[in-house]
UniProtKB/Swiss-Prot annotation:
Lineage of source species: Bacteria, Pseudomonadati, Pseudomonadota, Gammaproteobacteria, Chromatiales
Matches recorded under HAMAP family: 16SrRNA_methyltr_J
UniProt: S-adenosyl-L-methionine binding residues: E133, R134, D187
Disulfide bonds: none
Major subcellular location class: cytoplasm
The protein, known as: Ribosomal RNA small subunit methyltransferase J
Family note: Belongs to the methyltransferase superfamily. RsmJ family.
Protein species of origin: Halorhodospira halophila (strain DSM 244 / SL1) (Ectothiorhodospira halophila (strain DSM 244 / SL1))
């Protein structure tokens, strides 16, 4: 956990508290203070929402007797590393949509960083990444995961290519230097019942975490991105979903379950 990040839990109304796991009561207290939520003695068995498990690594857990397992942000995770190992500049659809196959060190803003998986893959492929995340708890978990990755010799190089900015993209994008926002990538939070890039447990946790908090609509995200990207905007969409309302994309790059709509700014 990074002591420098102070969080406002108002945009994470679904976060109910922190529960210590094993020998981590001090970590639980520190997380609770940072996030502005209570330390809970036990995991609630009923109700709705999300708790943070103070473990190594920390993880988010849905409430409820039949809730799926916890979701952690861990850039040393074997499944994520398999995805990185299988990604190349020319084969990975996101990398091609961003344009890394032509300019591997492109400066990319992942304006909706979420769990960081897409942004990590782009960084591993050579992109200079700026991550923006409006959720205080996700931003704090991303920060802690990046700190762990920087201390790991195998992943330090990738981690050093990432800068994290907690906050709202509509406010932060204008403050970024133009050289750091050649491409702006957004992965909107899709409504319940739709298929998004992160399915299953991660999507359930993110929806429960944000609960009724209202962030920018996807067309507002697109407008903000188009207003500040210097080369292009890339939007992740379900394969059969309509494009985000607004100007039509210049083209699309298809993946297995999703597609990436590309909006050329200077093209």
């Amino acid at each position: 956990m990074h002591a420098g990040l102070r969080c406002d839990a108002s945009t994470d109304p679904g976060l109910c508290g922190v529960v210590a796991v094993g020998d981590h009561p001090a970590a639980a207290a520190a997380w609770a203070e940072q996030l502005g939520v209570p330390v809970l003695e036990h995991r609630p068995q009923e109700g709705s929402g999300v708790i943070l498990l103070a473990d190594e690594p920390p993880a988010l857990q849905l409430l409820g007797r039949r809730a799926p397992g916890p979701v952690a942000i861990d850039f040393t995770d074997h499944q994520l590393q398999r995805r990185v190992a299988g990604s190349t500049l020319r084969r990975d659809p996101l990398a091609r949509a961003v344009g890394l196959h032509r300019r591997p060190q492109t400066a990319v803003v992942d304006a909706t960083a979420g769990l960081g998986h897409d942004g990590w893959v782009l960084a591993a492929l050579g992109a200079r990444m700026t991550w923006i995340e409006r959720s205080p708890v996700l931003a704090a978990l991303l920060d802690a995961a990046l700190e762990r990755a920087r201390a790991n010799a195998q992943h330090a190089d990738t981690a050093t290519r990432v800068r994290l900015h907690p906050g709202d993209l509509c406010h932060l994008l204008p403050e970024l230097d133009a050289t750091s926002r050649e491409v702006v990538y957004i992965d909107p939070m899709y409504p319940d019942g739709s298929t998004r890039g992160a399915v299953g447990r991660p999507a359930q946790v993110l929806r429960a975490l944000h609960a009724d908090a209202r962030g920018p609509d996807e067309d507002q995200l697109l407008a903000a991105a188009l207003g500040h990207a210097t080369r292009r905007v890339v939007v992740k969409r379900p394969q059969r979903a309509a494009p985000v309302a607004g100007p039509p994309p210049s083209r699309s790059v298809a993946g297995r379950a999703v597609r990436f709509d590309v909006y050329e700014v200077n093209g």
